Amino acid sequence: MFFYDWYVGLNDVIYDCIAILALGCAITCLLLILHRSALHRLHLVYADGSRRYCQFAAI
């Protein structure tokens, strides 16, 4: 009986770990996607700013 309880407890822990890992992966993926688009936007702004600066410096 003890072994059965231990097995069920272990299964609960494993399922909890899987759920936490899945949630963690989903959050990480979401953050990466958001971060990537934010980086892309930031890069566009930076590229635009540096282009203007170069034009200003060329005058």
From Swiss-Prot:
Intracellular or extracellular location(s): Membrane
The annotated consequence of gene deletion is: Knockout mutants displays reduced infectivity.
Q: Which domain of life is it from?
A: Viruses
User: What membrane topology is given?
Assistant: Single-pass type III membrane protein
Listed as disulfide-bonded, the cysteine pairs are none
Listed GO cellular component terms?
membrane
Give the principal location in a single coarse category.
membrane
Q: Which UniProt key words apply to this protein?
A: Membrane, Signal-anchor, Transmembrane, Transmembrane helix
Kindly list the residue ranges recorded as spanning the membrane.
13-33
* Keyword Repeat tagged: no
- Protein name per Swiss-Prot or TrEMBL: Protein ORF5a
Q: Which organism is it from?
A: Equine arteritis virus (strain Bucyrus) (EAV)
Which gene is annotated as encoding this protein in its UniProt record?
A: GP5
